């Protein structure tokens, strides 16, 4: 069975519609696909309606504040009809909107006008993310690549960055649990944290009642995966895997390059056992 438990659609900052994403995943022989758009579950129904043979797991990726870092917690196997979940996600989207407006003001002060308006147009009805800003800035030739825009304008310490006020990790875990889901710490090695801070993060996540951490992601060294697997084991956390697919590209594909080390307890066994 091929599992991919982390990906994005046009319901947040992905390039493919939920239907296109599901069709692509089916072509890639994915059996179980979790749709995990940023702070929304809006793409789930269309994805489920489009699936012919794969199973769609309802999910979301919640932005959290932790010591001034943006940390992402993925919720899997959610009851998306749960009101408390939808209320919390709606609050997050309001924060996104206010942050985006402030990002626009800060960029304008630095002489870069009208970025918020363009980013908003790109996002349409989806929650507005820094990816939308990044696309606008690249389009205007202000940086040579999507990644460089973050280094130059959008990541912490740069002119377009606005300190976050997302919910905290405990609140995200609680929200996910109330909606009968499982809480997964997303991509622990992608936050620009030292190993010491990653250990602290995983340990706190476990203490707060988190269920799993992502251990297998594309382009990760075996050593890194082994290290995350041992951290999970140490804190009695399950393991998850996902591509974090946003757009078709040469180095990231749905369901590819994902395999958990043997000692891991796959998170999907938890809902399969229900
Ligand atoms: P936001 O949740 O609005 O802060 O936007 C975060 C999204 O921007 C992430 O989910 C990624 O898709 C993208 N992103 C964040 N940081 C980077 C980075 N350094 N390089 C490329 N993409 C990034
Ligand atoms: Mn994203
Ligand atoms: Mn993320
Ligand atoms: Mn993601």
Residue ranges and their predicted role:
Residues 1-70, 154-155, 167-250, 259, ...:
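An N-terminally biased module of ancient metal coordination in phosphate/nucleic-acid-related enzymes
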Residues 50-203, 258, 263-265:
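Extended substrate/RNA-proximal surfaces in nucleic-acid metabolism proteins
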Residues 84, 250-251:
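A short acidic, helix-capping loop that chelates divalent metal ions and anchors anionic groups
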Residues 254:
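Short clusters of hydrophobic/aromatic residues that line enzyme substrate/ligand-binding pockets
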Residues 273-274:
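Primarily interfacial, aromatic-capped hydrophobic alpha-helices that serve as membrane anchors
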